[in-house]
Amino acid sequence: MLKWIKGGISAVTGMAEPEYGKDYIHSVADRVKNKQPYRETSREDFFWQAPDHTNVESVIFYFSDLKTGIFGFAQVIHSNIIGLHTASQFTFRIFDSKNPEDLNIWTSTKLENFYIEGPNFYADNLSVELSEDGESYHIQSSVCDLSVVDLHIRRLTPGAKIGDDPATYYGNNINEPWGSMRHVFWPRNACHGTIKVKKEVIPESDEEESSADEDDNEDEDEESGDSEEESGSEEESDSEEVEITYEDRTITFKEEDPAISTFIMAFQGMKPHHAAKAWNFMFFHSEKYSAVLMEFTTPKSYANTKISAGIITDDKEVLAMTTNNLVEHLNSEIDSVGWKVPKDIKITFKGINTKVKDEQLESENGTEQALQGEDEKEDEKEDEEEEEYKNVAEENKICAVVEGPLNNLVERIDVMGEIPSFVKNIVSGVAGTKPFIYQYADPKSSTLQINGGEKIHGVAWTEVTFISESDVISEESYNEA
């Protein structure tokens, strides 16, 4: 009971969690062990859940142009803090991976008067709508003048989720969890429409002077302290008078020659630093194939448990949904903020063809122990199921490997600099929490290899996220406060 109380309190307040161990994490992967993990999504799978307890829910539409190397995403984030404060944000990124200095725009805009209708999301000057047939989304946003978005996303393959219930639960009772994590996917889609951006134009002659002024201002701010707020306001007023010049640009993805998209709906029903200590996300697209990986590792409070979802598709079908994946960070070096950041990445997906049904994986002898004790029957049934699974899986295996460099950094995002102050105060109270997201875009060097076949070249987007330091489990590890 004490653990349950502590878990419930910490899940909503952000306090450091005690040691629970693996019995308090109910992985979606465990529920589909020795079964077919793939389930096709329905329209209802993409209804917003929006519960009244602490959670963060989001939809994110990634796009990548195989020809131009332009990457990006449009995202709506809906959050609820302790049931007291609800907020929504629209974030947008566009990046030219072949000419990074020419186009790299990021906007994040607070939404007003937002509301949810099933799978649809609305706010002032924004709408995200799922078609009645569940085949396409239409995203329109003019909430920020710097990034006006009008995109259509159409499924090229079925949607994908792990099992009938694609959620991982936290707590001692799976029926009454104190936290959860859920993902549903459209792994490969066509994206057409327009993106109108305003790119800030900085005269070359002013760049060095501007940089020097920024350094001087930082020094002055440190010396003046909080007592000179009035002076700071005057400086801010002066800076606002500086005229900023923008270059208008329109990026168009044609319906007959679309960009390729990956769409994900995510739900996180607890504080971010309690749910996971690290994340790996990647999508790979080529003319004929796609691969998607979403993986997180829990904090030591939940025994550093890894939960991994992988998807391999061709241009029409989902080939495999995998939970047995290996992410290798290669040639890593500690950077200026203290994280061990990889220079290359290798991801191995292991699973079975989606055409294999659960019935084929069930042992024919699973119901023949009627006269045996319950425990003995259960043990024998598990052994037989595992053996049967191995036999069928070997005949229908899908093993895919994605490899690529992480040398084209889009941005290193300081999460603490992006989240609202009331959330920041909660998260920063936990020692060792310093969340950073590293985003990379590779326009040509990444490869996908399926079942030892030829290596297929394509584009890849990778996000490596570090949240808290907790590699080794010990008694001291659980005393983070």
From Swiss-Prot:
Protein topology in the membrane: Peripheral membrane protein
Domain of life: Eukaryota
GO terms for cellular component: cis-Golgi network; cis-Golgi network membrane; cytoplasm; endoplasmic reticulum exit site; endoplasmic reticulum membrane; nucleus
Residue ranges, annotated region (Disordered): 197-251, 358-389
InterPro entries: Ceramide-binding_SVF1, Svf1-like_C, Svf1-like_N
Post-translational modification: Acetylated at the N-terminus in a NatC complex-dependent manner, which is required for membrane targeting.
Molecular function as annotated in GO: ceramide binding
Misc. remarks from the entry: Present with 45200 molecules/cell in log phase SD medium.
Name recorded for this polypeptide: Ceramide-binding protein SVF1
